Amino acid sequence: MGALPDAQAQQALVLAAQQRLNAAPQRDAIAVDSRGPATALHALLATRRSRRSFGPDAIDAPTLTAMLWAAAGIVADADATRTTSPSAGALYPLQYFYVNLRDCGAADASCPAPLAAGVYRLTAAPAGRLHYGPIDADLSRSCAAFSSPQLLDRAQGVLVITADFSASAAKYGPRALSYVPLEAGHAAQNTLLAAAASGCHAVEIGGFIERELGRLLGL
């Protein structure tokens, strides 16, 4: 552990990463099947970008829920219920919170009420639905919870993924420290892809202040 690199050193790290990405030999490389069943997914993956600028218009509640469901949703199979992302041992340690930074309205009659600004706990419901459990309508702590609060400017909201490691640790011991964050990454990517499919900008951020974020979420 040590001091963070300065701006010039950070840029050098980014440049080195780009060089690694472009260092693969072109000869004998196998092309992706452009007409295969995964073509639409490949196109979506190519579209996904980390975008830190957001428009002035609010996202309607059904569109927002579709993006959040990609991470926090459940799917009922014939023999069991599972989440939208893989979970080691089917223990499902992840918990989801959503900070709605501005009101979003109802798009149609299927969404009977707008979603007010505030902090919510997300709980998956059957048939592709999410329940927003209100925690707090006061968003005054939101800026203090993130190390780069300017990213919140014009953003519709923030999905926060937390986890209870206890069940995973009981089964897997220290490996839970790898398995649970891996699962969180799966869930986050699901929402980022859903945002890309919806034509919305989104970015994953890790710069948060644990204590302040915990207070914001009521943890």
Regions found by a protein language model. Name each.
Residues 1-154:
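N-terminal amphipathic, basic helical "cap/leader" segment at the start of enzyme domains
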Residues 217-219:
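A glycine-rich helix N-cap at a beta->alpha junction
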Residues 48, 67, 96, 157-168, ...:
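Small-aliphatic-rich amphipathic alpha-helix that forms the alpha element of a beta-alpha
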